[in-house]
Amino acid sequence: MAAAFGGAGYSRRGRIENPRYSRLEVCAAMTLACALAASTVQAQSDPGYYRPLTLAPADAASSGGGGGDDAKAKAAELAKQLQNPIASLVSVPIQNNFDWGAGPDGDGFQYKVNVQPVIPITLSEDWTLITRTILPIVYQQNIVGTSSQSGLADTTESLFFSPSKPTKSGWVWGAGPVFLLPTATDDLLGAGKWGAGPTAVVLKQEKGWTYGMLANHIWSFAGESGRSEVNSTFLQPFLSYTTKTFTSFTVNTESTYDWQGHQWTVPLNFMVQQLVKVGKQPVAFQLGYRYYAERPADGPDWGLRFAVTLLFPK
């Protein structure tokens, strides 16, 4: 999902009547276009290379006569786990976020890559610990004056203790601590503070639907004395539907409330995701559009998302 689950505070304003595109933006667009073209060429030259999970002859052959049904069942379960942020599934989402319209003149741009490994650890027959890390790599320009910054931003680490089985009514939940680590390589990309607080997620999955909420709150407790304190709430309600061909349609918000500045940042995300196999590797590709319903004074107007998630089922 996402991760994806993390939020960022921006400043506001946002007109894009006269957008100015940097070489980085052009290169990013060209890279994406080349990647899509390369995958298309590969798919045409080898139809078995890039395919929906339902068309996995190697899996079917290994299971005998009923292999096709077995492969479909495994694919369906994998698609279901993909929509669960605390599933017992090792995954590595790489989320590319592009935002436009920020900064004092409304011509700011930010490109953020969130590397978000998810690792479940079995504690006992009844309990699992799920670690979710968000490591952001950022390039931005014209957001703080006319300058640009690039490098690592602050890392968020969430630990969810979750029952191994859903409740009798089908609800899945997890709770634990969340930590803010001051890993930013530029003062303008991070808070300069250590932070911690509670985090929790609750969700239900039935008949192809997944719906629920992820939330956390972080207070700073140490760090650079000259920097503002961190006191922020993150809320992510989500709703998704997965088809029989393992295409998922998702709508969510990744809302942050800054209690220091009394300001909401509310991006609405609309995303589509397809689960496929690249060679023998299960991979999910996601495209999304983001509209900022509420934002600080110099925040972005809108954004796009392209994500690739590598899956490592047991």
Predicted features, each with a name:
Residues 1-73, 314:
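Cleavable N-terminal export/targeting peptides
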Residues 45-314:
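Transmembrane beta-barrel domains of Gram-negative outer membranes and organellar outer membranes
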